[in-house]
């Protein structure tokens, strides 16, 4: 819970009783008026999804968890650089804004995140935000321009991130139906973790 930002993130545990979740939701509505709440849970748990749908919550696509399990390929990564001062402005201009972890928040938490860039002809053409402070570090975002994607710079970003992350483990969560994205991570050495899909739902609590 981040009171100053009126934001709540909740990973919902196991429950098969809709009444139990409805009671918890009522508690949050009474005590956190005006907050935006993101909930992550098993997409097949109707005891949780049912009450949220009735309240008009916004459902994101189902997510597939992938874990690095195999060696990454040996490819050229000369175009990949860590974020440094000359590239900050371009990185911020390119970065997704419809997310909690905006470029500005990433920059203010560099003890928690590593940022790698695709640099070609003096221009930032892609970036990867990944955790750096855990035994299993999560990739938060990978973005490429169309040109960088066609050149295969996404795989180069992943290979370099994996090298810098050693000896720690790495994971990522992608849309379950994103075939091209899943293929990219598979090529880098990731495999799907079956039975661990999740879904994120955003619910704006009335003030």
Task: Report each predicted region and the residues it spans.
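Conserved donor-binding loop and adjoining core beta-sheet/short helix segment
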Residues: 1-32, 120, 125-146
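Conserved acetyl-CoA-binding loop-helix of GNAT-fold acetyltransferases
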Residues: 17-30, 144, 150-163, 183, ...
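Hydrophobic alpha-helical segments and helix pairs
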Residues: 24-74
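Conserved beta-strand-loop-alpha-helix junction that forms the acyl-donor binding cleft
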Residues: 38-48, 171-183, 198-205
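Conserved active-site tyrosine of GNAT-family acetyltransferases
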Residues: 50-53, 184-186, 190
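Conserved catalytic-core motifs of GNAT/GCN5-like acyltransferases
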Residues: 58-70, 173, 191-206
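Short amphipathic alpha-helix that is part of the acyltransferase structural core
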Residues: 63-64, 70-101
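Active-site rim helix/loop that mediates acceptor-substrate recognition in acyltransferases
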Residues: 95-124
């Amino acid at each position: 819970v981040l009171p100053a930002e009126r934001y709540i993130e909740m990973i919902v545990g196991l429950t098969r009783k809709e009444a139990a979740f409805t009671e918890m939701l009522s508690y949050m509505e009474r005590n956190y008026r005006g907050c935006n709440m993101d909930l992550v849970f098993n997409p097949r748990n109707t005891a949780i999804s049912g009450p949220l749908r009735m309240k008009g919550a916004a459902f994101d696509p189902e997510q597939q968890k992938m874990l690095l399990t195999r060696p990454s390929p040996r490819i050229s990564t000369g175009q990949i650089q860590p974020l440094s001062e000359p590239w900050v402005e371009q990185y911020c201009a390119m970065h997704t804004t419809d997310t909690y972890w905006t470029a500005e928040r990433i920059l203010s938490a560099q003890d928690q995140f590593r940022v790698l860039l695709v640099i070609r002809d003096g221009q930032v053409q892609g970036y990867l935000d990944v955790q750096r402070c855990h035994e299993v570090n999560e990739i938060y975002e990978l973005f490429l321009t169309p040109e960088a994607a066609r050149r295969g710079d996404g795989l180069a970003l992943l290979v370099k991130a994996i090298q810098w992350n050693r000896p720690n483990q790495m994971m990522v969560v992608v849309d379950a139906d994103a075939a091209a994205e899943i293929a990219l991570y598979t090529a880098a050495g990731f495999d799907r973790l079956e039975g661990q899909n999740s879904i994120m739902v955003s619910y704006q609590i009335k003030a």
